[in-house]
């Protein structure tokens, strides 16, 4: 069998890893072995945090809605329950945006929800 040399394959693989390691500090950017370890770890973090981001944003939206609800003399849980009873199908992302940027519209929604309570 003919001898197989890995020059081209290795160079491509190293370039791919070192390209992903751009922005890392010191040896984690320049040395292949350290860069490979750090890239593997960073890809795991990326995968995990893409899921955590959804949780974090939902939590942020709830905090914002709760703060705006308290200004309108209603608790968050009662407000969400009243929205469901009133068949107002706005998600938390939209409600949080209204609470932050359009207080009058949010107050109108709260008034509609209070009618059903």
From Swiss-Prot:
Signal found in the keyword field: no
Pfam family, one: Ribosomal_L20
GO molecular function: rRNA binding; structural constituent of ribosome
Coiled coil region boundaries: none
Alphabetical UniProt keywords: Ribonucleoprotein, Ribosomal protein, RNA-binding, rRNA-binding
Keyword Signal: no
GO terms under cellular component: ribonucleoprotein complex; ribosome
Protein name (Swiss-Prot/TrEMBL): Large ribosomal subunit protein bL20
Organism: Campylobacter hominis (strain ATCC BAA-381 / DSM 21671 / CCUG 45161 / LMG 19568 / NCTC 13146 / CH001A)
Phylogenetic placement of the source organism: Bacteria, Pseudomonadati, Campylobacterota, Epsilonproteobacteria, Campylobacterales
Gene: rplT
